[in-house]
């Protein structure tokens, strides 16, 4: 099978590409290698992917002509869109960058899929779409009409755009709502990475809402495993579905949405404790108020995911954080 993986030099795109290659698939990876964070980390990921069956193209998703040419010559069978422009707080400071990548770039991929008969499009959505929802755990049956950040709004828009193309053109599309992904080769702007770096350098860490937050931390290997299983679960039109009686996660079109999370929310302070234990260092903490765009808790209802792939993420925070610390020390020689 031949795959196009966008954001292949990024955290999730790298891990998914690696798993696909290990399974014997061909992978064409693309990334614009922007300097939002350390490009050398992205290059290091690509070096590990440089093996038979992998090709890389530096291209921006918002490059309409470039993306059209890539699809026309690529002869892809399936497409995985990994997360682009992820940080909630950064989206408040750089809204146009998010529109270019998450909206214009997403549209270019949908057009490429439409005109080139892609078998299955899997794309990254986010738990952030649940926004002001308070009912726990978050279910794909819930409304997601009240986002609290521009990033979340673009992810909601992606789901709507994907549904439109599924409905109009019969494009099988699966949306993946990821819940706080962490682990080896993670992004430097993520809490675990920032905390680890600061603690090893003897610096303080910023703890928002005074630590009174919960996240459904989900280990990267579990995320990749779920994606690998879901790529073979190609959605079909549900002729019995109606707006009045059906779940928002399905449709009369070949369209589905799933939560991918650990289904076990962890207090931020417990997450930090796991890191302190793994590093053998007590963190110096700056206790700060809740930041704009943040929510107090996330929790994934993954029953629908389990029903179709027989798998739900299960790596504990203790084990996952320890694995990250081992990778960080090895990669940065600290």
UniProtKB/Swiss-Prot annotation:
The active site is at residue 151. GO terms for molecular function: lyase activity. It comes from the Bacteria. The keyword Calcium does not apply. Substrate binds at residue 126. Keywords: Lyase, NAD. Transmembrane segments: none annotated. InterPro entries: Epimerase_deHydtase, NAD(P)-bd_dom_sf. Belongs to the NAD(P)-dependent epimerase/dehydratase family. dTDP-glucose dehydratase subfamily. This is Uncharacterized 37.6 kDa protein in cld 5'region.
């Amino acid at each position: 099978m031949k795959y196009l993986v966008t954001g292949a030099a990024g955290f999730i795109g790298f891990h998914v590409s690696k798993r696909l290659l290990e399974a014997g698939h061909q992978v064409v990876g693309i990334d614009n290698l922007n300097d939002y964070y350390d490009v050398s980390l992205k290059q290091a990921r690509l070096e590990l992917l440089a093996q038979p069956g992998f090709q890389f193209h530096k291209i921006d998703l918002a490059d309409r002509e470039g993306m059209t040419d890539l699809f026309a010559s690529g002869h892809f069978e399936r497409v995985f869109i990994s997360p682009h422009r992820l940080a909630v707080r950064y989206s408040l400071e750089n809204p146009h960058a998010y529109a270019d990548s998450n909206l214009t770039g997403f549209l270019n991929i949908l057009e490429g899929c439409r005109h080139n008969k892609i078998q299955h499009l899997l794309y990254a959505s986010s738990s952030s779409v649940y926004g002001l929802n308070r009912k726990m755990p978050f279910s794909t049956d819930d409304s997601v009409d009240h986002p609290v950040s521009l990033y979340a709004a673009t992810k909601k828009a992606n789901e709507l755009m994907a549904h439109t193309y599924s409905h109009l053109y019969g494009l099988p599309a699966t949306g993946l709502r990821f819940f706080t992904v962490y682990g080896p080769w993670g992004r430097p702007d993520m809490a675990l990475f920032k905390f680890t770096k600061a603690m090893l350098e003897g610096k303080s860490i910023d703890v928002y809402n005074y630590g009174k937050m919960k996240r459904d931390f989900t280990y990267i290997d579990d995320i990749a495993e779920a994606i690998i299983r879901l790529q073979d679960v190609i959605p079909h039109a549900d002729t019995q579905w109606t707006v009045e009686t059906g779940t928002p996660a399905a449709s009369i079109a070949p369209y589905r949405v799933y939560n991918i999370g650990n289904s076990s929310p962890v207090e931020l302070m417990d997450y930090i404790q796991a890191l302190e234990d793994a590093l053998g260092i007590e963190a110096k903490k700056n206790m700060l108020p809740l930041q704009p765009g943040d929510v107090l808790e996330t929790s994934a209802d993954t029953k629908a995911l389990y029903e179709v792939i027989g798998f739900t993420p299960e790596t504990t925070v203790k084990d996952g954080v320890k694995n990250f610390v081992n990778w960080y020390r090895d990669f940065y020689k600290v």
